Structure formats: structure tokens, C-alpha cells
Amino acid sequence: MWGGNQSEGTRFRLFPQPGFLDSYAEPEVVMVSSPAGSVMEGPSDDRMYTIFPIGKPEPYGIAPNGEDVLAPPWRGDIEAPAQPDENGHFDYLEPGTPQFETAHLFGTVRFVLDIWEGYFGRRIPFHSEKTYDRVELTIQPTLENAYSGYGFLEMGGDRSTGSYKPFSLNFDVIAHEVGHSVIYSEVGVPDPENVTGEYFGFHESAADLVALISSLHFNSLVDLLLENTRGNLYMLNAVNRIAELSDNKQIRIAANDRRMSEFADGWVKEHHLSQPLTGAFFDILVDIFHEMLLDYGAISPEMEDLSDKLLATADYAPMMQEMFDEAYADHPEKFKLALLDARDILGTYLADTWERLNRQDLNFVDVGDVFLDVDQDHTGGRFASIIRGNFRLRDIGFVEVGPQLAPLGKDSHANSVRTLLPMD
């Protein structure tokens, strides 16, 4: 990864998916690029610091009186910070303590930044760097949400099932918020007075894609994913259960069938508006995966053609699953290599695309056009037909999104604490 020799990095233990899921009950040891000994208590480094405040009355943002703005740094009491071991690592910490939570939050943010700095080929600055030397990573149990804002990333938790599930232990939620930070830095913070609905949808889609691709950097998740699906990624599975909160509740499913025509009369929630774009990119990921399987000789051209013809028909599951079962049994190593290749191709293409986008009047057609340009630059257009076909299936470029039909709700992230900026 960009930024350091992994053999000399710092170890953390992270849950690839929420730890209350049976398949992911134990955290996995990962190595981040920060050299061992460079991450101090907190954890903290030269770019960010992690705290678990005691007695912090409200999350950052607009105060309940509607006048004051609560902003970092928090200057009150905090839980005892996590300490590195004698070799500079944090993987000795056990779940169930504030110190493990703060280490998990810091380790996840650093892990995701490593991944995306690898795709960008450079350091990704935080958009708050002109004001704050470091970003505050904060755990706020009274918050039933998670936000990446100006100078902070704040994690609450979920109480919808009756028991508290902290987002500081949820890799997908944290990675999603890091995704927002990446887009704020690379594309820009939306201007509420001059922004398109599709920009809001693009932002949510990009954050989901950051979480999706980042999760595929866990060997345990990739192995379990392939073992469960036998390589048939159109099955509903771990990789497209973004921000999963329980075994049967999924948010923003990437493998969706939503189209832009559903929003021709207008839109209300940017999360819904994001789904055609996220779905198009998930389908592109799967199609590139199939191309890589062909390159490795793991499937035949006839099998790929049949998969394309039967997709979205009642015959797909019974016929194609048997063929995938046989092919995966013969070539499990090639299936894994093909998936990792597809992951890195999509990650690199997205990074190159986001670098070139302009937030002004941004729409999904712009995203697709730039993505095609990136493919042309990298391969001479090898995947152009795949890209065009999947955008066409989502009506992107063929249907214009209607107006915003209602004010953004309390659950909206588009016009929220995330987009508050200091006055110049």
C-alpha cells in the first residue's frame, strides 16, 4: 500500500463486518502503513487523534438552541486512551473496553486511507487541513448516527433493535464516513444553494463504494464470500450488505435493480437516488470479475455468454449456480485472484474519476463519461462496452431526474453537520 512498508507497519484488530454476526465474531489482525512506534496513545498520529469523551452533552454541529456551533476540539474529560504495546502495536487490546473501541476506530480510518491512498497514488488531504492540524475521531454514544464533518469524524451507534451497537466497531459505517471525507477533499463540499440532487446521490454512492471496495481488502471476507457464493457474486452476500446492522437488515444494497426512471417525477432521499449509480458500479465490478476469470482460464467464454444472457431471468439462479459451483471447485485460487484484480481495477478507476470531477452541476452522466475516459487511458477502452451497458441498464443518460419533492429530512446527510464549513 502507498505510504509505508507493510512489514514495518502498526498492527490493529478490526472487525471486517459487525462483530455480532456469527461469521465475524472475532476481529482480524491488520497492518496499517504507519511505522511501528509512530502511533501514540489515543491512538493518535500527526494526522488524527482518537478520544472517547466523558460528559460530552451533544454531538458536533448546531447546538439545540439553534445558535451555537459545537466544533472540535473537545476539551473535557475522556476515557483513558489506548496505549501501544512495547513494540508500538495495538492488536493486544480486547473487545469490550473503551480502549478497544478507540483503537478500532483509528485503525479502521487509517486502514481505509491506506487503501484509497494506494488507488490515488498519493496522500489524500483532509478538507479541514487549512483550519485543523489534525482530525478528531470521536465516540459519542448519545448520537444515533455517524458523521464526517469539518475537522472531525464522530461515531454514534444503533439502538433500533433494542440493544446498543456502536458504530465505532462497524467497519462499513466508518469506511462510509471516510468515503465522504475523500469526496469532500477531491470533489468538494456541496453548496446547498447551488447543487444538483444527483450530486447528493453521487456523494452517497461514492461513500458506499469506498466501504464496499475497502471491505474486499480483508482476506477473511473475500474467502468467505467466495466460499458462500462459489464466485456467483449476483447472490445476495456479505460484499453488498453495506452498513449491515443485523443478519436480515441491509442498508443501501449495492446489488440492487433500481433505475433512474424511478426518479423521473422527482426525489426525496439522496440515499435512494444513489442506488442506480451504486448498482451500475457493482454490476461493472462483477462483469470485470468475469473478464478476469476468463483471463485466468477459470471459466469458459460460453459460460460468461450464458451468464450475460440469463441475467435477470428466472433461469439464472438454478442454471448458473451449478456452473459456478463446478468452476470454483476446479479453480478456487484463480477465482480469488480474479476478484482481487477486479477490486483494484474498480478502485483505481474510481480514484482517477473522482480526481477529474467538478462538483458544479455534477450529474451521473458526467460520472459515467469520465469513467469511460479513465478506462480509455488505462486499457484503450477494454471495458467500454461493459461500462456503457451497465449505465444504460440503469437509465443513466436516458432519463432526467425530477425535482426535489420535499425538504431534506433529519436522516439526510447531504445538508447536515457534514457540510458545515467555517466562515471565511
Question: Model-derived features: where do they sit?
Answer:
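Zinc-dependent metallohydrolase catalytic domains
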Residues: 99-102, 109, 113-152, 157-174, ...
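Acidic/polar low-complexity interaction segments
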Residues: 1-110, 114-117, 126-130, 184
